[in-house]
Amino acid sequence: MLRMDTVHRDKDQVVILKKTNYLPYLVNLFIPKLFYPEKIVVARLYLNVNKHDKHAAENFKGTETPCFDVPPSLFSDKVPMDKIVFLPTVMLPMGFEAGGVFGPGVLTRRSYPIDLKAAGHKGQTPPLFIGLLMDIQAPTKVESLLKEVGESQPAQDILMNWVRASNNLINGEQPKEQELRDEFSLSMVFNLPTPPSPPSPYPYGRIPLQFNIYTPDLSNVLLLMSHQRDLTVAILSTINNPHVPSVAFAAMGDEEECPKFELPLSAFPTFEGVNRPIFLPKRFMPKGFEAGCVLKPGALSDLWFMDHIGRFGPTQPQHNGSITPPLFVGKICREEPTVDMIRKIQLEIEKKASEDATLPAVKPKIDISITKGFMVMETAAEDPKPPKGAYSVQSYEEAFDDGCVVKVAKRVATEATDTRGRDEIRTSCDQSQEKDEGSAEADKKHLSCFHVDSDIDNIAMAMARMGVADMSLPAEGEAMPGIDGDRALIQLSHVMEDRNQIRTHTDQLMQDHIFRMNSNRMLALRQPFTCIGCGAQENK
């Protein structure tokens, strides 16, 4: 696409359409920028996409079409200006006040724009579109916003533009091309935000696009209309409203009834085969409708959209812009009260904005304890600083609440505990006295806890500084059913004492495994392998 110098055109400058050898429908032609400082746009067309419309040629032949003076400076060689075919207004892309096309093979290779011609192109030159943009004076704020945001317009902004357009319709600002019809009213689609679905653990391939059937789920869609009729039509989007296979199974199955109605013959043609309308179950229809059907992409012709919807129809993003978009036809339920869709959309936007603004902290209803500690250790009173990798606690209760399951103390404290455990009969006075002594003894000593994922070398180093120390499990046997506490302590002691040997043995096992893998790989490749011990190469 090329942008050239600006030209001036009178509003009443028209020409009679006589030559209709190539007359494409270019409403879906995408121009990648909203506002241009220049007004003339030159774009290459493709015959397989921008096809000749025979019905439009027969319908518009002999009518007046807007035209403009094409400057000869656009081309490097002489061009037959009399062979340009100016398009009717309803066939122009959005944002153009006039435009014409040179058919395939009309322009010579020398006169065709070099930037738009593919390298190594053979055969006749492709068709060319030359359009004159409307004189749009964007506000200063809009121009600065477009420079900051970029060339593409977000989908949400387009959606809000539709909402503003619906407000203009309600206020009585009806465009001339949108006539009030008795058969149906035109609606605009608003998709409510849906929560994201959790990721599936089973990956699956992408469903290929298909146009033999189209059944979207419209239960979360709002339809905005300027005036209410028994029937309403709305242009759908294959991107925002994709095909859902489960809806197709429900529409073709016998599980539930799909309410049906007759489409008026004065407004809709007779559908046959795959183009026939598909009526949706009520749970997949928008709210406020008693029946509804969907016409798949390409079921209606371009002329139908031009005659019944016109250029006012809100554009929707589509996977394929070369065919007509899908259409929803719904029958409004008169029994249900009317819903103020505009107000509902405003409340939805305000709710989302308030949720995004502040997210207050939510306190859990119950206290969920997270395991922090693994081993509680008594350190000497003269060394109040906890060992490396540990943190201090005030009492054994705090350590046990953090999840400590192993207690490490000096041999003297352990023997005293064992002596008290061997006493079979103890009076209540003795128990209270022992409790007071234990609390007083705990006050004189410092308690430190190690995490579950603490470095085992730091734990072993702290135990070595204590001298002769014993490990015990504070929990009783009833709290750990099926666990042999003595055996667990013996295994933990072996891990602490023989950790270097365990690491060396594990490293040797990994080296042996690597050697076997390399040997098997070399044997499979019929190549000599190198011995790890001596470095010599051997053949087997």
From Swiss-Prot:
Residues 417-443 have a biased composition (Basic and acidic residues). InterPro entries: DM7 (IPR006610). Residues 416-443 are annotated as: Disordered. Transmembrane segments: none annotated. It comes from the Eukaryota. Keywords: Repeat. Coiled coil: none annotated. The keyword Manganese does not apply. Belongs to the DM7 family. This is DM7 family protein GD24576.
